[in-house]
Amino acid sequence: MGKLFGTDGVRGVANLELTPELAFQLGRAGSYVLARHEASKRPRILVGKDTRISGDMLEAALIAGICSTGADVLTVGILPTPAVAFLTQRYQASCGVVISASHNPLEDNGIKFFGPSGYKLPDELEEEIEELVLAGTQELQRPQGEDVGRVYLVAEARNNYLDYLISCYSQDQNLAGITVVVDCANGAAYSTGPELWSRLGAQVIAINNYPNGVNINERCGSTYTEGLRRAVVEHKADMGIAYDGDADRCIVVDERGNELDGDHIIMICALDMNSRGELNPPLVAATVMSNIGLDIALRRENIQVASCKVGDRYVLEKMKESGALLGGEQSGHIIFLEHATTGDGLLTSLKVAEVLRRSGLTLSELARGLEKQPQLLVNLRMENKDKILAHPLVQEALKQAEERLGEWGKLVVRPSGTEPVVRIMAQGPEQYLLEEVIAEIKQSIERAQA
């Protein structure tokens, strides 16, 4: 796989790139590095996963690796990624590990580490773990007898997480009378998602909540909202929510069946927080992929947008750097820093419902303030991404595209950190212009690859 850690942990095709052998080595190296940094002879590492069929295989190997160094494991089973982050802090674990590839296809899986405070592991520690794995972990300690690590099932973990989410919701905004359609993506929120809404009094219609190990993200969830949009209209629901495979993001659907992405969610929540004096400073963090319309809508209310690279770790960095309490991505990764250390789809959807209930408006009315500029996003699969993008033909095409889009447009070219894909996004006043510049860029890439 080359470099192991990408922007979101270690990912690859399960049993081919992300093998049980690699999971075992990550368990050994991770527990050793963390034990050394916290000077603990017996670290406790919390482990969760999503619903992929390969999760059991990788979990068994990972846990074996951890226990082989003398560290103990707290297993929480199938839970959302943000639940693992929260529970790591809640149980004072040395670190948390989640086995998931989020919104990626079934064949993929991933292993991601969280530090004891619930934040993603710092780059330096990931590098230490990676170096140790690549060098080989055969020489690391192998305790015997009672010093071998134990595995503990944390049966109450799920309820601890749900209780915390409910504590983040304004108790005077009961959801009785609200109808919500919840698309669980046959993923990690298949159980916690519907129960959360039921406990708050909403009428819940759950879809894609019967995972079988192979149907995660299959024509459902936050990247495929067609079924959810139909269900919202059919049931005359007040809102629809689509989580992804590990429920660290969500997309919302209004009562008319229109999809509201992360830009809409940021605007709705930022305006509400600002009106109540809770957005201090009056600032949000958003990635370069956000629509220019978000900037315009927020600046009307004197709220600034701090821009950053794509990836929730970069959103978090920008939030810490700027003091922003709210930040996120168009894809639906939203961070409420007063409540969570990472993007949490369940928490985000609750916060939108809170605004819906408090305002007395419909979701379509709340979203009306965001007038999006036309946008075109294409994903191009290619190997040697950096080499191709640096080619003079491609560089010249990108330069000409930026000139054509002008000051009211935006061009973003971003190699994916987890897939052999380059994402090209163009925004501007006219759709035909976007189609032309994207076509010219694609043509230059094809010529560079020839």
From Swiss-Prot:
The answer, when asked if Acetylation is one of the entry's keywords, is no
Per the entry, the cofactor note is: Binds 1 Mg(2+) ion per subunit.
Q: Where does Mg(2+) bind?
A: S102, D244, D246, D248
GO MF annotation, one: phosphomannomutase activity
| Modified how | Activated by phosphorylation.
Q: Name one Pfam family in it.
A: PGM_PMM_III
Cross-referenced NCBIfam families: glmM (TIGR01455), PRK10887.1 (NF008139)
Q: Which family does it belong to?
A: Belongs to the phosphohexose mutase family.
Q: What is this protein called?
A: Phosphoglucosamine mutase
